[in-house]
Amino acid sequence: MAAFQCPPERVLRPLARAISASQRRRQTYEKWPTGRKSYRAVMCNELGKPLVVEDKFSTENLGTSQVRVAVHSCGINFADILKCIGKYQEKPELPFVPGTEISGEVVEVGSKVTSLSKGDRVLGVCGQGGGMAEECVLPQTALWKIPSSLSFTQAAALAISYGTAYIGLKHKANLQPGQTVLVTAAAGALGLASVDLAANVFGAKVIGASRKEKLVIVQEIGATATIDYTRENIKDKVKELTDGHGANVIMEAVGGDVFKQCLKCIAWNGYIIPVGFASGEIPQIPANILLVKNCSAVGLYWGAHSKHDPQLLRESVDKTLEYFKNGKLKGPYISASFGLDKVNEAFQMILQRKSTGKVVINTKQ
């Protein structure tokens, strides 16, 4: 037998640590009051690499204002994908669980939670991620009760898209009935939400711009006119559709050349609201056009309101739920849903621009 090259206790030390850790986990399980030992979650362990599904241990004790939710669905936002490939402005520390929008059922509440009870159906916003899992813990202020008429899948597609559209159209642009709204990337989740609110709630005329094969759903949601921007010039088409006046409000999510074309067809005293850069090109805004047309370029990042104006953020979701309950909305539109184990396929569907509306991860599939 070969002699040990190092003391046996050093060889056995890692095994001892592993056994000790296993014992600690078992003790945690035994103390867990609801009997829930672990839950499955999507993990980003390395930027740009495939996501994996792993078991995570439940947080044993809730904070006084926290709520534990059994997640049924998690909506995918493009920001989730950008975070996982390292191209988002916010850089989560690795490893992390992606996912911002969730829906599910309350299973436990902290001692000072007054707005929610066990069994409530809710939607929620995970400001720090963590939604692509079977369970998450959120402050009560990040959750909303949902009506029975709203499915969990739909609820996971509501807050960010409709909240952004609401703040942009209502608070940034003060949209009025009869005005013209141009929506780029109109077949995406935010685009369809903007079309839905502008046409069906605020009474505006809506022009939706997207690829030809996706324009049917844009019209079904409420657009009165559409533009295939792979074949048609946005500026010329908008001028034609508005008798030369241009669009009063532009919800712009593409950037690059599309943004430049949009700025050239804005109405006098109009608003252009950049809400994303799907093209990957961040445009420069020529101030001379703003001056001559007396128009405004107003940025909108919905998530920042949680810090700077939480009351408006909450209003944006409250009002959206009210519109849904009153039957004013045609969406949210879901083009596909996947189980946790198919999350990489879901991301690819979005990256390859094969989706319309929202793509959702369902934990119960």
Swiss-Prot record:
Species, as recorded? Nematostella vectensis
InterPro entries linked to this entry:
ADH-like_C, ADH-like_N, GroES-like_sf, NAD(P)-bd_dom_sf, PKS_ER, Zn-ADH-like_protein
| Keyword entries, A-Z | Oxidoreductase
Give the record's family classification: Belongs to the zinc-containing alcohol dehydrogenase family. Quinone oxidoreductase subfamily.
Q: Name one GO molecular function term.
A: oxidoreductase activity
Q: What is its EC number?
A: 1.-.-.-
Which top EC class is given? oxidoreductase
Per the record's keyword annotation, is Oxidoreductase included, yes or no?
yes
Name of the molecule in the record = Quinone oxidoreductase-like protein 2 homolog
Please give the superkingdom of this protein's source.
Eukaryota
Show the Gene3D superfamilies listed in the entry: Medium-chain alcohol dehydrogenases, catalytic domain (3.90.180.10), NAD(P)-binding Rossmann-like Domain (3.40.50.720)
Quick check: keyword Oxidoreductase in the entry?
yes
A Pfam family that the UniProt record links to this protein: ADH_N
